[in-house]
Amino acid sequence: MWNKSSVDVAVSELKKESTASFPKPAVVKSIAPGSIGEELGFEPGDQLLKINGVRPRDLIDYRFLTVEEELHLEIMDSAGTIHYVDLEKEADDSLGLTFTEALFDGLRQCNNQCPFCFIDQQPPGHRDSLYLKDDDYRLSFLYGSYLTLTNLKDSDWKRIESQRLSPLYVSVHATQPELRAQLLHNSRAGLLMQQLDWFAQRNLQIHAQVVICPGLNDGKALDNTLQDLAIHAKGDWPVVLSTAIVPVGLTRFRPQNDGLIPIDTKCARQVIAQVELLQKKFKKTIGSNFAWLSDEWYLIAQKPLPARSAYEDLPQQENGVGSIRAFLENMDIATANLPSKIQKPKKCSWVVGRLVEKALIAASNKLNEVEGLTLHIFGLPSAYWGQDQVVTGLLTGADLIEGLKNKDLGEQLLLPSVMLKHGEDVFLDDMSLKELCETLQVPIRIVHGADDIVAAAIED
């Protein structure tokens, strides 16, 4: 939980700023069974207006405010009736509430114009949320999404300091000021190194990301970027905790003549050799590999993935760095005690992106050693995005229909959850899971990881 001194500072800051803006109420989505919220009578749809007289701007404010032991809540129910509730609790007791949104005062959108932005490489006509350019430091703190730091106001920097919002996840791309400003099409992007100094002076930390665009920020520029970041990775309290290097993703919808070059096998091998050489240097000077390549580099280069130990504690797993090794490790654990056979013969299918198919064949082969079980793995391209080699999370409903229609999928199709919008059964092209199921005429089971895949395969 938040320590007492931080809470005092944070609540003080909240009270100063509470009249400067007027966020929307926090709408309750669910209440944990047996929680204080349930005891108080909260219901989905109720609106939390104020906590101790302060209107929370977001989930971070809510967490800071509710750590107080004495709370005065102002709530409006679905009928529009206002309720005032006073309660006492322990500092570490949660109210047990979740909300429909994490931000009650709106999303901070990006003010850059990066030519490689994936949001700009989508077709028009889909749900609005697909076109929102998130560059919000609060979502970075809460969920690990990346931001550029170019749209922060003085009040934002003060809040980051007072509420100790650390670590944040920062899209760096380049540390050389002119180059970063060029890449982001924003003069404020050149302030990054001063901003890292600001974090250092306050003992705040970040994780970094570099999206490689061949001919722009690779080669010598990449060397400079990683070595500049590594300077801030030293000491007992490093500012930069880790750096992920990821390849630029290009789709068939991107603007013509954008000057961007796709990553090919030759480029991938050059970048791997370059970064692995720097890793050896960082291991000696920092005690960590510090900078890691996302799994796609090795798959594109047709090279073996590094050993699991090379990724240390997987600081960038959610960014696709070491995620395949982590999955295979979990699969080894999940398949350690497989039955020699299943009573009722079973045939099912598992669909993944073509880029990762070869890396996962060993996992499917191990399941196929169970007598009576047949698991077929389908690695699909994406005609939707115009990518032959695609990661699993970018496959759309249309891609699945095109790749799987009229195929023998067996009794069940195992579908990784990363293809669907979080919390909803809808793909990136707005096709619903129900529509896909009806078209393919096969039961579909959503799987979230190795344990789910093994359970789905061997269960009756």
Region annotations inferred by a language model:
Residues V7, R63-F99:
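PDZ-domain C-terminal substructure recognizer with occasional recognition of PDZ-binding tails
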Residues L216, P238-K266, I286-S309, S382-Q387:
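Flexible glycine/acidic-rich beta-alpha junction loops that bind and position SAM and/or redox cofactors
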Residues A208, I245, L293, I377-G379, ...:
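A structural preference for short, hydrophobic beta-strand core positions in alpha/beta folds
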Residues G80-I82, K89-P238, G249-L278:
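Conserved Radical SAM active-site core
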Residues G37-R57:
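Conserved PDZ fold ligand-binding element
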Residues K24-P33, G53-P56:
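Short, structured beta-strand/loop micro-motifs enriched in basic residues and often containing a Trp
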Residues G53-I60, S78-G80:
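Short acidic beta-strand-loop surface patches of small beta-rich interaction domains
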Residues M1-S21, V27, Q302-D460:
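Radical SAM enzyme core and accessory elements
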